[in-house]
């Protein structure tokens, strides 16, 4: 006898200030990810533009705005450009480890430095270690933390300079949240490198896509995602190739915006 399928219940948040476009309001639809079919539900929702935050899947459903567009990199067709190849060579000595979704004091310390430098007034600015543990460890799906470290010395692990909370889905990997060292001049472009390394990892694993969350038209800090081509965007007719206007040369590297409450892990 097969288990009875239960259709998920969806809810809508109350409108609030948009963290990406001044003067706009945001609203989200969300559902709980729980039970034996949580991973399958997350996969299905991910293909129609939902993102995961702990045990919840959500997507924007704003009344008067459709600027948030789901985007994903076609991993097996991606070819790094000259500046991206330079970053790959520069950071080729980093030790990369795929870790279980358990938090460490070292990860939290790096997160605090990252938020102080990049998002001092954001919703995560007051996050404590318990909040961080909830963000990483409360997951009903296959997830892990990818760590990026300086080379080991005398048999001891090197300094942690980057990390990314990453979900593995049936058709790709979803980068939930990344953070990295921002004040080390010898390690420029770490955020970009982390994305490049995830694209390589997906392609080598036979996974077609790397989900980058939302590209937000009109938000300057979200434009870096268009540097990773070929890129697809989700519209009412499905996924289509997407090329945004050219961007300035890459600087210190990309990073995912800091979340505050439900729905800002995009």
From Swiss-Prot:
GO terms for cellular component: cytoplasm. GO terms for biological process: ubiquitin-dependent protein catabolic process via the N-end rule pathway. GO terms for molecular function: arginyl-tRNA--protein transferase activity; leucyl-tRNA--protein transferase activity. SUPFAM superfamilies: Acyl-CoA N-acyltransferases (Nat). The keyword Cytoplasm applies. Belongs to the R-transferase family. Bpt subfamily. This is Aspartate/glutamate leucyltransferase. It comes from Rhizorhabdus wittichii (strain DSM 6014 / CCUG 31198 / JCM 15750 / NBRC 105917 / EY 4224 / RW1) (Sphingomonas wittichii). The lineage of its organism: Bacteria, Pseudomonadati, Pseudomonadota, Alphaproteobacteria, Sphingomonadales. The gene is bpt.
